[in-house]
């Protein structure tokens, strides 16, 4: 599970980074990239410049930084990936509150949630990989020696 979770998390983080940075660039260059300006009516924004910069720099940046740290096996990679996953979910919550529902939001919220679940898997917080009883203290490594 650990090797699979690590590789899957790296792939998801790179995907999230590229997607958010690409969306940020498109939104900055094309003022929302085709998203109607009327979605911003109830916000303090008059254009998509600031939201696009936040998407590209903050969301894309944390996703990319977490992917790089995890790829390099840095000690802070789990924390960075957790921040990136929750950041993605918070971004989607804010989007839902401001502009309403779109199918892509389900995908990206799921991406953030899956990132957090994979971090929990890497940390062993989802339970032991091998079923044990209170009297059994043999770990997986000891059993395979």
Report the location of each language-model feature:
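Topology signature of small-to-medium multi-pass alpha-helical membrane proteins
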Residues: 1-145
């Amino acid at each position: 599970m650990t090797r699979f979770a690590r590789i899957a998390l790296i792939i998801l983080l790179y995907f999230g980074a590229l997607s958010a940075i690409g969306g940020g660039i498109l939104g900055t260059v094309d003022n929302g990239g085709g998203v109607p300006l009327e979605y911003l009516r109830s916000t303090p924004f008059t254009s998509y410049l600031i939201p696009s910069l936040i998407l590209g720099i903050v969301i894309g940046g944390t996703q990319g930084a977490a992917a790089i740290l995890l790829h390099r096996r840095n000690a802070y990679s789990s924390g960075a990936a957790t921040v990136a996953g929750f950041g993605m979910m918070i971004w989607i919550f804010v989007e839902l509150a401001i502009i309403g529902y779109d199918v892509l939001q389900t995908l990206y919220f799921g991406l953030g949630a899956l990132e957090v679940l994979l971090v929990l898997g890497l940390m062993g917080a989802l339970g032991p990989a091998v079923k044990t009883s209170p009297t059994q203290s043999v770990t997986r490594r000891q059993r395979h020696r």
